[in-house]
Amino acid sequence: MAIWFARSKTLVSSLRHNLNLSTILIKRDYSHRPIFYTTSQLSSTAYLSPFGSLRHESTAVETQADHLVQQIDEVDAQELDFPGGKVGYTSEMKFIPESSSRRIPCYRVLDEDGRIIPDSDFIPVSEKLAVRMYEQMATLQVMDHIFYEAQRQGRISFYLTSVGEEAINIASAAALSPDDVVLPQYREPGVLLWRGFTLEEFANQCFGNKADYGKGRQMPIHYGSNRLNYFTISSPIATQLPQAAGVGYSLKMDKKNACTVTFIGDGGTSEGDFHAGLNFAAVMEAPVVFICRNNGWAISTHISEQFRSDGIVVKGQAYGIRSIRVDGNDALAVYSAVRSAREMAVTEQRPVLIEMMTYRVGHHSTSDDSTKYRAADEIQYWKMSRNPVNRFRKWVEDNGWWSEEDESKLRSNARKQLLQAIQAAEKWEKQPLTELFNDVYDVKPKNLEEQELGLKELVKKQPQDYPPGFHV
């Protein structure tokens, strides 16, 4: 690559000649564009061409040299023109404060009693949509409870709940288009549930049987569905963010009427991939909605030990990304914010960051005991007094769309369906152990063949170390 560029007169001319990017690498009008738009401006915004952006781009050195004197004469006396941007100057030495004196407010629509706050700005939700949202939130609660108990009974090896974050799961999913591509972390099964992933499919993945789309190779809760535009979950934290920027950019290049949506927790923002993903999406103006679940805890690490900034929302502005802080326990606020962000990302071809303020009621996973690092009273308070499902239910009931009879019937049916799904998943055979060595290379190399043979010999020598009915 370096040799190729060295042979070119300039980087720009090289790209133009070799990649046919003459329409991209042109001078831009760097005049100020408004950060915020009125409703009428947003509604009339045309679809932006992938190559019609206003972002700053490099120009040829020779072009800069030819017009240097002219540029200096034209620059306002109060501004300095640097390659990094045109900026004003001051004779006063003043450091930017580490934070604003006032914290960024949190957008909400419903109060704690499920009543709409007067003069709230939100997108109306129909009875049909509201009822479905609540049904899915309640089903997610039941699913989490039963799978968690199944792990405690030794029927599955691992589980991780979304207790306390049901509104973020379901309301955000409801605000998206089925064509939008989701790159999740590991606490968003509700998004997949909303899109049509069945309870049987959830159970098959958790049990790692032959019906599991991942062929039993992944640990439980690492779901994925190509059919539902839901990338398979990966364990490494934050790797999905740069990937989401790339997927979003590909949607932009293909002029798709869709965006990428990716999730991460507050702890994940300490990973380098968080910053790389945001910067990548901002520079390339990729239609990506970044949703951060700020639930206060990164396993046992409190947010006070994660960052000193005003949460996550302020990090978006640093990368040139529009951002908003939302009450993640308010389903109406989550729905309105995500739907608005989604429209902004698609119509304006830009990334958006949403910080969802919430609380992780459950343990980090079945491998964790959170009472060792936080008070039981604190957990109970958020479980009972700040429960997002109960809060949304009050609003649905106040509208006359839900009753106690509906509640009892829904939870009873969900429980029966889940128990049946678990029983069916247990009856499926497990994948043979040698399946581990397939789908890695087109032609299996000698070293893998040797490892496979060694594993077979080990199982033969020590069969007591493997469960009954285990297939090699």
UniProtKB/Swiss-Prot annotation:
One cellular component (GO) term of this entry = mitochondrial matrix
- Pfam families recorded for this chain? E1_dh
Transit peptide start and end: 1-56
Q: Where does thiamine diphosphate bind?
A: 185-187
Which SUPFAM superfamilies does the protein's record reference?
Thiamin diphosphate-binding fold (THDP-binding) (SSF52518)
Enzyme nomenclature, EC number: 1.2.4.4
Which reaction is this enzyme known to catalyze? N(6)-[(R)-lipoyl]-L-lysyl-[protein] + 3-methyl-2-oxobutanoate + H(+) = N(6)-[(R)-S(8)-2-methylpropanoyldihydrolipoyl]-L-lysyl-[protein] + CO2
**Function noted in UniProt:** The branched-chain alpha-keto dehydrogenase complex catalyzes the overall conversion of alpha-keto acids to acyl-CoA and CO(2). It contains multiple copies of three enzymatic components: branched-chain alpha-keto acid decarboxylase (E1), lipoamide acyltransferase (E2) and lipoamide dehydrogenase (E3). Required during sugar starvation.
Q: What else is known?
A: Bound potassium ions stabilize the protein structure.
What does the similarity note say? Answer: Belongs to the BCKDHA family.
Protein name per UniProt: 2-oxoisovalerate dehydrogenase subunit alpha 1, mitochondrial
Organism this protein belongs to: Arabidopsis thaliana
